[in-house]
């Protein structure tokens, strides 16, 4: 990996962590962030000014946070779009503007969702981000996981099942499944691919989703199965 690529990776991780903290409602100290990420205050200010300019931020005495006063109603459409595109809408019965607004305006959490797994490492967060970009942009990637290297892999969907993220992809004409935890590196390629509609429909099948933890065993068993009446080679 070149120096420019490493610098780009550090930038992507830094921005993803900053955004996640802002969305979580944290008020961030620019100086503390600079020390944490090992960059200058000037670099952090450029991040906020240029790379995060689309966020509605407010600054005061060296601190930064998402603007919230009087903006809850403006956030409702964005929350609904995010919920539907991420697949979270199905968790909330009858999710609409009224429900989103009620959740945004309350001072306590009326809903409880089972705790997720520990926060992924920076490399896991970067892999997740790159896979989102590859799926939406329909670009092939090189994937390096535990014991495997897949060139020109076409990522299809990211699914969460039993608190584990899975990548479902197509590789050399076959379905490939990986957990996010076992992925070490995702290298985006310039080559694009045509979406496989049949695979996209399959990953939405509840039976397929339930089988994700056992997918490789099932696939290996099918590929190595030899009928009893098969002639010897």
Swiss-Prot record:
Keywords: DNA-binding, Transcription, Transcription regulation
MF terms in GO: DNA binding; DNA-binding transcription factor activity
HTH deoR-type domain ranges (all copies): 11-73
InterPro entries reported in the protein's UniProt record: DeoR_HTH, Tscrpt_reg_HTH_DeoR_CS, WYL_dom
Regions recorded as binding DNA: 28-47
GO annotation (BP), single: regulation of single-species biofilm formation
DNA-binding as UniProt keyword: yes
Annotated WYL domain residues: 120-193
Protein known as: Uncharacterized HTH-type transcriptional regulator YfjR
Organism this protein belongs to: Escherichia coli (strain K12)
């Amino acid at each position: 990996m070149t120096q420019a690529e490493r610098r780009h990776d550090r930038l992507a991780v830094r921005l993803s962590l900053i955004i996640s903290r802002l969305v979580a409602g944290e008020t961030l100290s620019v100086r503390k962030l600079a020390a944490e990420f090992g960059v200058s205050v000037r670099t952090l200010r450029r991040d906020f000014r240029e790379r995060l300019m689309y966020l509605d931020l407010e600054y005061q005495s060296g601190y930064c946070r998402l603007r919230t006063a009087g903006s809850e109603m403006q956030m409702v459409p964005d929350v609904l779009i995010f919920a539907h595109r991420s697949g979270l809408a199905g968790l909330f019965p009858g999710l609409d503007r009224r429900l989103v607004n009620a959740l945004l305006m309350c001072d306590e959490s009326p809903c409880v969702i089972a705790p997720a797994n520990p926060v992924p490492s920076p490399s896991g967060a970067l892999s997740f981000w790159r896979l989102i970009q590859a799926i939406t942009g329909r670009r092939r990637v090189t994937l390096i996981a535990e014991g495997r290297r897949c060139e020109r892999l076409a990522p299809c969907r990211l699914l969460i099942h039993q608190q584990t993220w899975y990548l479902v992809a197509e590789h050399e004409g076959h379905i490939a499944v990986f957990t996010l935890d076992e992925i070490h590196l995702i290298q985006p390629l310039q080559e694009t691919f045509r979406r496989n509609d049949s695979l996209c429909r399959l990953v939405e099948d509840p039976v397929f989703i339930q089988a994700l933890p056992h997918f490789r065993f099932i696939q290996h068993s099918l590929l190595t199965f030899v009928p009893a009446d098969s002639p010897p080679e």
